[in-house]
């Protein structure tokens, strides 16, 4: 049995899913969206993402965190923002000792 926390990062909405793999069988355990208020300062939004991901790690005790790679077209500003959300997620994984993979 292996539990993995999957993350689709973003500063406005960060999606997550928790999956249990037993052999070749997969089961969804949890999933949702971490939403932040665009009117809040960025540092507070990132702190909210970090805190919620840390809570999810403590609740589900995953063997790993899988985080979506950074993809962007023409909008470098969006890519920078998503990169900051990725950093908040990676910090949660690092501080709880859970390996993080892209």
Where are the regions that the model predicts?
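Phosphate- and other anionic-substrate recognition elements at nucleic-acid/protein interfaces
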Residues: 1-102
């Amino acid at each position: 049995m292996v539990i993995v926390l999957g993350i689709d990062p973003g500063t406005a909405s960060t999606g997550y899913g928790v999956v249990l793999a037993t052999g070749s069988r997969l089961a969804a355990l949890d999933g949702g969206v971490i939403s932040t208020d665009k009117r809040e300062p960025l540092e507070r939004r990132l702190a909210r993402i970090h805190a919620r991901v840390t809570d999810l790690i403590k609740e589900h005790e995953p063997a790993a965190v899988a985080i979506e790679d950074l993809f962007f077209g023409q909008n470098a500003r969006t890519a920078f923002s998503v990169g900051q959300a990725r950093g908040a997620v990676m910090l949660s994984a690092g501080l709880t000792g859970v390996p993080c993979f892209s």
